[in-house]
Amino acid sequence: MAIPRLFFLFYYIGFALFPFVSSETFQNSEQEILLAFKSDLFDPSNNLQDWKRPENATTFSELVHCHWTGVHCDANGYVAKLLLSNMNLSGNVSDQIQSFPSLQALDLSNNAFESSLPKSLSNLTSLKVIDVSVNSFFGTFPYGLGMATGLTHVNASSNNFSGFLPEDLGNATTLEVLDFRGGYFEGSVPSSFKNLKNLKFLGLSGNNFGGKVPKVIGELSSLETIILGYNGFMGEIPEEFGKLTRLQYLDLAVGNLTGQIPSSLGQLKQLTTVYLYQNRLTGKLPRELGGMTSLVFLDLSDNQITGEIPMEVGELKNLQLLNLMRNQLTGIIPSKIAELPNLEVLELWQNSLMGSLPVHLGKNSPLKWLDVSSNKLSGDIPSGLCYSRNLTKLILFNNSFSGQIPEEIFSCPTLVRVRIQKNHISGSIPAGSGDLPMLQHLELAKNNLTGKIPDDIALSTSLSFIDISFNHLSSLSSSIFSSPNLQTFIASHNNFAGKIPNQIQDRPSLSVLDLSFNHFSGGIPERIASFEKLVSLNLKSNQLVGEIPKALAGMHMLAVLDLSNNSLTGNIPADLGASPTLEMLNVSFNKLDGPIPSNMLFAAIDPKDLVGNNGLCGGVLPPCSKSLALSAKGRNPGRIHVNHAVFGFIVGTSVIVAMGMMFLAGRWIYTRWDLYSNFAREYIFCKKPREEWPWRLVAFQRLCFTAGDILSHIKESNIIGMGAIGIVYKAEVMRRPLLTVAVKKLWRSPSPQNDIEDHHQEEDEEDDILREVNLLGGLRHRNIVKILGYVHNEREVMMVYEYMPNGNLGTALHSKDEKFLLRDWLSRYNVAVGVVQGLNYLHNDCYPPIIHRDIKSNNILLDSNLEARIADFGLAKMMLHKNETVSMVAGSYGYIAPEYGYTLKIDEKSDIYSLGVVLLELVTGKMPIDPSFEDSIDVVEWIRRKVKKNESLEEVIDASIAGDCKHVIEEMLLALRIALLCTAKLPKDRPSIRDVITMLAEAKPRRKSVCQVAGDLPIFRNSPVVGLI
């Protein structure tokens, strides 16, 4: 009996201890599983360095893994949470993840994973939260998570997932957050989602979903946020959405939605944000919208909405943004809008609104931005628009406003842009604009303004653009050109008289000066040549007299000079045609005389630009008379002493020789002359005009246009810009379908005309250019501007590119235009990726490698999809050997690598430095040499100094893009760090372009996403006016 009793005693003790032994053994097993999980990861920052076995490990060791970074255990010692966000991890998520049966939370967000998720995730039936957002996971999203009955949060946003949404997620009836924004999902929303009665957040924006917006979403009564924009959803907005009484945020922007806005939305009393912009919505605005009493942001822009703005909009007392631009609205602007106490942005431009602006607009709200341009509005401009002292942009152009400009407008200290052109404004320009510290842009053209331009405008330190053309102004301040930052001054078609002001500061910034069609008299001031940055000077149709100042030939950036329709006398300065930048010269209808200079520009000038000067001759005009030619050479007949007999012999012989030469010369003159004008036919007669232009088109692909088609567009009105090596024209080639190309006419380098060695040097340089153009013509990459071909003759080369409709990156970033392009970080990031990929192609996929040498924002063009294209290879170098040496420093100030200035050695790292500066522009919004920098430093040194002082780098990022969105700030700071690596002082410390690609991929932002919750959204984040106020 004793033996059985002992047996049962030990059996009982063993059975009682089994759970503890099993538990301890399994916990030890979880340590091994974690280590196996870690072995599949790449951890460059060593965040998981404490994940290691204890030194004196025993079978029943302490549960050390519960204290490892990111690991959280439950009360029984099992792994319950794995929180590994923001650790720069990459690699693969191991199948071992399924071996944590108690795992409730898995957070891998904001890392650098570029793999697929294991299907075994479906075995984690205890899972409540899974967050894999902001990575580059690809493939289909794992099926089976719907079996986790307690699942509340699924966030897979900002990845590269594709395929269809898992149908089984509809079984997870406890789900509260479902976020799949910023991926490549397609198909429709699964019908099973109708079961998600506890769902509060539904984010599917930025994918490829199609079909109709499911009506069943309107049955999910717990929903607070719906973000479905940037997809291909069609059809109408479900009326059922009006049942979502808890809804606070509705985003259906940028899709193909049609029909009317449901009136049922007016029942949503908690709704704060409605974004329906860029769809095809029609019909009238429902009056019931006035019932959304909590509404803060309402953006219905870029649709086809008709009818009037309902008066009930004036009941939305919390409204801060009202954007109805680019619709088909009619009627008046309701006066109650002026009573909205929180209104900051009112955008109504490009509609057909009539009547006047509400009299009290601006007096009851902190109005920051008013744009009602391109309507049919009339009446006076309200005087209280800046009553709150917050107004930054006043855009009223292309209407029928009348009366005077209120004096209160020019006492508004926050104003940045004033655009009131194309109205019926009368009276004088009020004084005070020179005292406005932020005013940059002033457009008052095409009105009925009279009187003088206020003297204080010349005192402005911020004004860069002034257009007062097509008015009746009569007095111009003598110091108008002294404004230190003035870049464009257009005052044509006025009644200005007297002499042109000549008070010019030492280093003026003026680039465009247009005083045409006025009554200016006297001579052209010599001091105009002090405008070192002047590109275009237009003085046509005045009453100017005297000679053309010789100093104009020394203006190094002047490209367009129009002096026509004046009373100028004397000769055309001989050096004027030798200017390497001057492309357009018009001196027609003056009183000029003497022979046309024979150098450079004048060899190809259009005779129409010279007509109306009876004394001009030679060149493309009829030849000069003998007496004029002799006098032009300074000969004195009184000093000619020859024997009459000898003289007669010489004359007779000369006549015979001259007759033969005249015939040959006549044909030569006609050939050159007929290239540009039929004017020559009035003087020389031939049987048959030349049928073809002496230009040749060399095509790099099949083209549907000719050299003549290109040449017919080389005129001033088609100029769209200038680069390092030429002037760029837009050419709309007349073929069906219409094709638009960009043509770059290369600058001519000046050289002595009679030097044989220099002539051979010119030929060698031209051969080099053609050789280089041919090489570049073979480049094929989506981020390189495609060269279609080139047109050339014996003297000049014009390169033909595909046309980029969105201009260059520099303008997009730094232009103060209120409708600029890159209004969010995602767009800027994509530009950066495009530039890096284009450079990678040049450096690694071309043989020999191509070093661009002039990477800068102005040489990065944007196509119709805002994708970056590298352009302007005028300084490009084919690098056959490492560290090749060039003969001189080339590039653009602010972008040039420091070693380039003293070694003249180039390699890929020179381009990397310039790329880093472009990245800094994208992140900070600053120019390489920005007026806000002290001590004349550049953007690189500006940031380095902040780093040395341990100042927060969050202060340098572009606040208009980042807003208050924390994850956007983090993403921009990542890009900033990459830029700092690229701009390291020593070339060896800079990454290769392939390394930049890797790092930039790790900094990938959330695709078309917003902040996690509506409360974390920066103001106007998803609206077309984001970042513009």
Swiss-Prot record:
The Protein kinase domain covers which part of the protein?
714-1007
Pfam families (UniProt xref):
LRR_1, LRR_8, LRRNT_2, Pkinase
State any single GO MF term.
Answer: protein serine kinase activity
Q: How does it sit in the membrane?
A: Single-pass type I membrane protein
Entry-listed glycosylation sites: 56, 88, 92, 123, 155, 160, 171, 256, 390, 398, 448, 565, 586
Question: What are the record keywords, sorted?
Answer: ATP-binding, Cell membrane, Developmental protein, Differentiation, Glycoprotein, Kinase, Leucine-rich repeat, Membrane, Nucleotide-binding, Phosphoprotein, Receptor, Repeat, Serine/threonine-protein kinase, Signal, Transferase, Transmembrane, Transmembrane helix
User: Which reaction does this enzyme catalyse, per its entry?
Assistant: L-seryl-[protein] + ATP = O-phospho-L-seryl-[protein] + ADP + H(+); L-threonyl-[protein] + ATP = O-phospho-L-threonyl-[protein] + ADP + H(+)
Indicate what this protein is called per its UniProt record.
Leucine-rich repeat receptor-like protein kinase PXL1
Species, as recorded: Arabidopsis thaliana (Mouse-ear cress)
Gene that codes for this?
A: PXL1
